[in-house]
A protein has these predicted regions:
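Conserved amphipathic alpha-helical segments that form helical-bundle/coiled-coil interaction surfaces
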Residues: 65-142, 155-164, 176-188
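C-terminal effector-binding regulatory domain of bacterial HTH transcription factors
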Residues: 172-211
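Short alpha-helical linear motifs
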Residues: 40, 111-114, 149-157, 196-204
Length: 211
C-alpha cells in the first residue's frame, strides 16, 4: 500500500489508525485490514480521531483538563442542583466502597467528573470536559490495575474534598481542590511504567493542490 500511494509505511499505519478510530476500517491480527459495514463515528469521538492521527502527550491532556475541569468545579459550586450534589456524594461513596477493585473505582471516578461538568450549568463546558475526560479514561483503564489501595484511597479523599467544596458553595475552594487533584493525578501517572497516553506523533503529508 505504501508503494502504491507513494508514502512511507509509518504514514500508512497512521492513516489506518485514524480510519480505525473513525470506524471506517477494522484490523484483524494475521488477516489484514477490512472496511467495516457501519457508519463512521467522527462526530462522537473527535478527540480520539485527532489522537490517532497526531497523538497527545500526557502533559497536553492534563493542561486541557485543568483548563476545563478547574473552571467547571468553580461553576458547579455556584450552580449545582440538589440532584447533582447527591450524585457527587454517591460517586464518592462508591469510590470508598471499591478500593479493592480499581476498575469499579474508575467507573465512579468517570461519573464524578462527568457530573462536575454537568453541574457547571454550561453545556459547552460539559461537552468539552466529557470528551477530554472520556478519552483520558479510555487509556486509564489499561493501567488502573497498577493503582494500590493507598493510591485509590488518596484519590477518593481528593474527590471528597472537591465534593465538599461544591456542596458548601465555595467556588474558590472547589477550584483549588480540583486543581490539586489533577496535579497529584498527573504526578502519579508520570511515575507509572506504562503511561496511559502514549501515541507517537506522526506527520501526515498534505498534497499540494497545485501539483
Amino acid at each position: 500500500m505504501s508503494a502504491h500511494l507513494g508514502v512511507s509505511r509509518p504514514t500508512v499505519r497512521a492513516g489506518l489508525r485514524a480510519l480505525a478510530t473513525l470506524g471506517v476500517v477494522r484490523s484483524r491480527r494475521g488477516s489484514g485490514t477490512f472496511i467495516t459495514d457501519g457508519p463512521p463515528v467522527l462526530g462522537s469521538e473527535p478527540l480520539s480521531f485527532l489522537a490517532a492521527l497526531h497523538g497527545f502527550t500526557r502533559g497536553e491532556m492534563y493542561e486541557v483538563r485543568r483548563i476545563l475541569e478547574v473552571g467547571a468545579a468553580g461553576l458547579a459550586a455556584d450552580r449545582a442542583s440538589p440532584d447533582h450534589i447527591s450524585t457527587l456524594a454517591d460517586e464518592v461513596a462508591g469510590m470508598f466502597a471499591t478500593l479493592d477493585d480499581p476498575n469499579a473505582f474508575l467507573s465512579h471516578d468517570i461519573r464524578f467528573h462527568r457530573t462536575v461538568g454537568l453541574s457547571s450549568g454550561n453545556p459547552i463546558v460539559a461537552s468539552l470536559a466529557e470528551m477530554v475526560s472520556g478519552m483520558y479514561h479510555e487509556h486509564r483503564r489499561a493501567t488502573a490495575v497498577n493503582a494500590s489501595d493507598r493510591d485509590l484511597r488518596e484519590a477518593a479523599e481528593a474527590h471528597r474534598r472537591i465534593y465538599q467544596a461544591i456542596r458548601a458553595r465555595d467556588a474558590q475552594q472547589a477550584r483549588d481542590a480540583m486543581n490539586e487533584h489533577l496535579r497529584t493525578a498527573q504526578a502519579f501517572q508520570e511515575a507509572e511504567p506504562d503511561p496511559p497516553i502514549a501515541v507517537t506523533r506522526v506527520t501526515v503529508p498534505i498534497p499540494n493542490p497545485r501539483t
